[in-house]
Structure formats: C-alpha cells, structure tokens
Swiss-Prot record:
It comes from the Eukaryota. May play a role in meiotic resumption and pronuclear formation, mediated by a WW domain-signaling pathway during fertilization. GO terms for molecular function: chromatin DNA binding; transcription coactivator activity; WW domain binding. Disulfide bonds: none annotated. Sequence repeats lie at residues 175-181, 182-188, 189-195, 217-223, 224-230, 231-237, 238-244, 245-251, 252-258, 259-265. The gene is WBP2NL. Residues 298-309 have a biased composition (Polar residues). Residues 251-309 are annotated as: Disordered. This is Postacrosomal sheath WW domain-binding protein. Keywords: Meiosis, Repeat. Residues 251-272 have a biased composition (Low complexity). It comes from Homo sapiens (Human). Expressed in testis.
Length: 309
C-alpha cells in the first residue's frame, strides 16, 4: 500500500499505471482505519472520496473539497488479506480487510481498512475485485473495452463524484512511456489506402479503381441460348399407344363351357398339340373336355377297341 502517490497535483485525478484497465469507479465512498500503525496521523479520521478498481489494485482519491493529510491511498491486490463484505441493518454496506505497507509506500506496518459505500454497490465492487485479483494472480488480468492504447503510459482519471456525466465525461490525461508491447502498430496496420475511404452515399457507383466487369461475366455465350427443338414437345411416336394395345381380338373371347378358371401358368395347349399316349394314364376330366375335336380323332385305334370289348 502507498500513501499520497496515486493522485494528480490538483487532486482531481487518479494515476493508473500503464497496462492496467479501469474496471469500476464508485463515488461517495468513505475510508477509515479502525486499526492502524502508531506514530502517523495520516490514517486518523474518516475520508470521503472516489474509489477506483483496476486490473491490479484499488485506488482511493480523497475529495478535493476536504482538507486531509491523506490525498490518495493505493492498495495492490497482493497486499490485501482478510477481505469481508458486511451488510449492517441500519447502515450502508462496507468492505473490510487488512493491508500491508508496500516498499517505499510512505508508511510501514499494516492496517485494517474499512470502505463504506454510501451509494450502494459494495457487493458488486467486492465481487469484481475478487475476480480481478484471481485473474491477475493467474497472469491474465481483466480487460475492458475502455482500455486506452496510446503512445503514453500512465492514465489520469478524474476522481470527483459529480464531475463525470454524459454532458461532461471524465477527462483523461496521459503521462509516461508505454512498454514495448504497446508501441506503435506495425507498418501493415497504418492508415488505410485511398481506395478504402468512406462508402459513397447511396452507393451511386464504385470508387475509382473498380473497373467494369470483363466481358465473360456479361451475357451468356451463344451456346447457352434457347434450348433446341428436340427439347420441346415429344414427337408423334410418343403419343397415345397404337390400336393393337386396345381390346383383344375376337379369338380371345370367353373359354368354352366346362372350362374353369385355369391356374396361373396353366393356359390351354396351343393349336396342334397332341394328347399324351394312353400309357401315360388318364387325363383329368377338365383337360379332356378342353381338347379340340380333332385331337380326339387322332387317338390310336387300340384305345377304341378296349372300350368296346
């Protein structure tokens, strides 16, 4: 912890080291030290001011309207212990903890601090502070979209509670030189070339340097015209089927009497088919009835003589 080393000369700003992000700002905070080192009056009494939370530390800036020997008070995360958040019933919430003196910090020993948030927001501030301390301990400090990348290094942020409004935003003053990682961008990231200026209003036409499309992107070639006649209506041969596929001829009429529905695949024998000889056994009745008269006359005479005997 350091005393009177984190404020500007006019006591209206906080000095934030280069590479750190401002995570939160809480005005109207009261700082006191219930237990402190003896031999110094800088910790006596209650101080009112603005509290800043960065990626690595907490900075308290005493209000410039208050005459107090403590103008600023800086507490790094690694020197704070025993942090608690208290919620009294009839008073404002506050954060309490123990802080160790930093080397060359303007004092020695340790002290117990108490931060009372008169405007509320103590719980949110404590939660974000614990999160930032954990991230800093892992080597990945929290960042915000409000980070400033500049050729300078130390940022000064106004600390008065009622000075930062939408009509009058907080002023930023920069001092020092940045580390190597925050230097000027490489040549490839300079100003954009002339062809990448603002877009024309209404997109009237392409900027200078954009020629018309080549001919091959224009109308399609001749081979891609209307389809040939062969792709139109089908020819006459693809029309209705011929008459031969209509009703069957007269010879395919109903079967004679006594002929039942033949099983599938057992149609009647074709014309000129001869019956099997008598030695093959008797034919079924329906098959004999289905034979034509000329087939009956061709039976051998021996079968006739057996019938008459």
């Amino acid at each position: 912890m350091a005393v009177n080393q984190s404020h500007t000369e006019n006591r209206r700003g906080a000095l934030i080291p280069n590479g750190e992000s401002l995570l939160k700002r809480s005005p109207n905070v009261e700082l006191s030290f219930p237990q402190r080192s003896e031999g110094s009056n800088v910790f006596s009494g209650r101080k009112t001011g603005t509290l800043f939370l960065t990626s690595y530390r907490v900075i308290f800036i005493t209000s410039c309207s208050i005459s107090d020997p403590m103008l600023s008070f800086m507490m790094p995360f690694d020197l704070m212990t025993n942090l608690t958040v208290e919620q009294p019933v009839f008073a404002a919430n506050f954060i309490k903890g123990t802080i160790q003196a930093a080397p060359y910090g303007g004092w020695e020993g340790q002290a117990t601090f108490k931060l009372v948030f008169r405007n509320g927001d103590a719980i949110e501030f404590a939660q974000l502070m614990v999160k930032a301390a954990s991230a800093a301990a892992r080597g990945f400090p929290l960042r915000t979209l409000n980070d400033w990348f500049s050729s300078m290094g130390i940022y000064v942020i106004t600390g008065e509670g009622n000075m930062c409004t939408p009509q009058m935003p907080c002023s930023v003053i920069v001092y020092g030189a940045p580390p190597a990682g925050y230097g000027a961008p490489p040549p490839g990231y300079g100003a954009p070339p002339a062809g990448y200026g603002a877009q024309p209003v209404g997109n009237e036409g392409p900027p200078v340097g954009y020629r018309a499309s080549p001919v091959r992107y224009g109308a399609p070639p001749l081979g891609y015209g209307a389809p040939p006649a062969g792709y139109g209506a089908p020819p006459l041969g693809y029309g209705a089927p011929p008459l031969g596929y209509g009703t069957p001829p007269l010879g395919y009429g109903a079967p004679p009497l006594g002929y039942g529905a033949p099983p599938a695949g057992n149609e009647g024998p074709p014309a000129g088919y001869r019956a099997s000889p008598a030695g093959s056994g008797a034919r079924p009745q329906e098959s004999t009835a289905a034979q034509a008269p000329e087939n009956e006359a061709s039976l051998p005479s021996a079968s006739s003589s057996q019938v008459h005997s």
